[in-house]
Amino acid sequence: MNLRAGILLMLAATASLAHSAECVHVRVGYMDQHRPPYWLGDGDKVPNPPGASVDLIHDAVLGAGFGCEPTWVRLPIARLKVALAAGDIDMTPLGEQAYYPAEIALPRDKAGNIDLNRALHNTLVVLVRASDKLPARTNPMQYFKGKVLGAPQGNSFIQRLRDAGLTIDDGGRDLDRNIEKLKLGRIDGVVVGAVTPAHIKATLDKYQGTVVQLPQPMVNTRLWLAFNDSFYRAHPEQVEALWTWLDTNRGRLGYVMQKYRKPD
């Protein structure tokens, strides 16, 4: 090997090491069930397109300076929190809960409390049968006490609603199945996240006036991108940047959902 070739090889190796050092690999866990438009496809495969929530997390990882594509790990819903605490994955979406294991890191404010701003924000609304003719002033949190609300399996807000004294039937896997139960009279309403008005409108249009939305929202919810605590301590700069990115880009989920909207 001549001198010039040797120098070029050394430069290439140095550049490769520098690129590797800039890349923080993060394993992102999410549900292995088809929940359009947020998570698409069943099983451990990641389809193309993968879903609006996957797109959002992808944008957050790159926007926060991790320096490389995330690795996607699809797991049953019940395993995600356990896998995160065990370090089998580095990050997963996690909703509001009464207790968080010490092995899980969440964003904190200056007082050391969980940061309510650096999260994904959503508003829950209720879909009901048009034939019930509920008044526009109906307060969902009060009206549905003693009744049954349907919600898709695995949603992070379910426990919060149960803690508020509501009866939640989460046996239906997705929104369509819950609305069918509503039409059959097996439940009295369906809880759904109102990320964008267009998303709700598309759902209502599908049922041609038989299902309507109550005007008053039910409750505002938050969903954090939680990290394994050991991963956080190893890469605090990137993780903190990701949490701040979520706060700065609050409307991003509604934006990425546009490509999953079916044409009118």
Q: Which residues does each PLM region occupy?
A:
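Acidic, polar ligand-binding/catalytic clefts
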Residues: 71-143, 215-218
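Extended ligand-binding regions for polar small-molecule ligands
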Residues: 57-63, 131-134, 145-148, 222-260
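A ligand-binding cleft/hinge motif common to bilobed small-molecule-binding domains
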Residues: 94-106, 188-219
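Bilobed "Venus flytrap"/periplasmic-binding protein-like clamshell domains
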Residues: 33, 46-62, 126-164, 178-180, ...
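Hydrophobic h-region of N-terminal signal peptides that target proteins for export
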Residues: 10-19
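Extracytoplasmic small-molecule ligand-binding "clamshell" domains
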Residues: 21-103
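Short helix-initiation/N-cap motifs at beta->coil->alpha
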Residues: 71-82, 169-183
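Periplasmic-binding protein-like
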Residues: 31-34, 118-124, 205-243
